[in-house]
């Protein structure tokens, strides 16, 4: 009898001193926050997309517009003019995790295969994808460069939040001078080249601004002989008189914070490091978070 009592007391003491775990259901997982990263978008000739990672509320955008194309040469010389270089824009965009950002990387305007002889084109040299205007159809000037842009909450032209303008196409040159080169794209006001005084002070295509140029973002097509097409941009660049280059397309930073935009005839960040004067070739976009 005493042994039973002592045993019962010992068991009760042990149970009182051991805290058995209680289970109140599974813990809820913490919301995940994406680590930092970046994604580079090169030219493809079509729309691309970026899916905003989980936990990300702001992305940083760096973009470069495309260069305009080179026209031929009127007087059988080896001089090769150049299309205007593309501009640069950067800024921060507020986003929602899981949403889609629409990416448009501009293409370089089409150039003559050779600038060492007088060349007649059966078709105009084409403007670069995303807004570059065509060169004229006879002794064709170069095509305008396409703009690079980001669109959010839609894919229409009105959904653009940031734009880097493309350069104007080079007009078919009349001498070994720079009088027919295309205007640089980008900046709040894109470049307009000086008049071509070799042929009666002819006026080149006008660089676009925040309120002037082609509101659909497409550069003008060259209609006068030897004329380069306008660059694509927030507003598209113009095309000018005979033997002149197209105007650059303007940049835009109205839909981002901490934004800046630079014309392609000025110093800007080089995506490979350091700085450069304008973007040559196709455009480029880098998104980081």
Model-derived features: where do they sit?
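Enriched but not universal
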Residues: 1-51, 260-289
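Surface-exposed ligand/attachment interfaces on beta-rich extracellular proteins
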Residues: 43-54, 210-224
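Residues that flank catalytic or metal-binding motifs in active/ligand-binding sites
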Residues: 46, 57, 85-89, 99, ...
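Structural recognition of the beta-strand scaffold that forms the well-ordered cores
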Residues: 60-63, 102-104, 149, 161-165, ...
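Short, surface-exposed beta-strand/strand-loop-strand elements in extracellular ectodomains
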Residues: 70-84
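Secretome/extracellular-domain signature
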Residues: 83-202
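Extracellular low-complexity, Gly/Ser/Thr-rich intrinsically disordered linkers
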Residues: 218-289
């Amino acid at each position: 009898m005493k042994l039973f009592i002592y045993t019962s007391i010992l068991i009760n003491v042990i149970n009182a001193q051991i805290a058995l775990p209680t289970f109140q259901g599974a813990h809820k997982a913490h919301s995940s926050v994406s680590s930092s990263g970046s994604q580079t978008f090169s030219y493809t000739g079509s729309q691309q997309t970026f899916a905003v990672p989980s936990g990300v509320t702001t992305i940083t955008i760096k973009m470069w517009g495309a260069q305009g194309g080179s026209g031929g040469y009127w007087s059988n010389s080896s001089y090769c003019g150049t299309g205007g270089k593309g501009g640069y824009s950067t800024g921060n965009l507020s986003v929602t995790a899981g949403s889609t950002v629409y990416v448009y990387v501009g293409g370089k305007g089409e150039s003559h295969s050779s600038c060492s002889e007088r060349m007649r084109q059966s078709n105009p040299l084409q403007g670069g994808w995303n807004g570059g205007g065509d060169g004229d159809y006879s002794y064709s000037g170069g095509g305008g460069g396409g703009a690079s842009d980001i669109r959010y909450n839609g894919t229409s032209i009105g959904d653009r939040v940031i734009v880097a303008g493309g350069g104007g196409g080079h007009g078919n040159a009349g001498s070994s001078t720079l009088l027919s080169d295309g205007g640089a794209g980008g900046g709040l006001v894109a470049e307009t080249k000086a008049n071509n005084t070799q042929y009666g002070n002819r006026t080149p295509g006008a660089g676009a601004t925040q309120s002037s140029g082609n509101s659909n973002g497409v550069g003008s097509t060259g209609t006068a002989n030897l004329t380069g097409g306008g660059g694509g941009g927030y507003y598209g660049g113009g095309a000018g008189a005979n033997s002149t280059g197209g105007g650059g397309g303007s940049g835009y930073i109205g839909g981002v914070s901490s934004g800046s935009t630079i014309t392609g005839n000025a110093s800007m960040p080089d995506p490979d490091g350091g700085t450069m004067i304008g973007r040559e070739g196709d455009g480029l976009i880098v998104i980081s978070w």
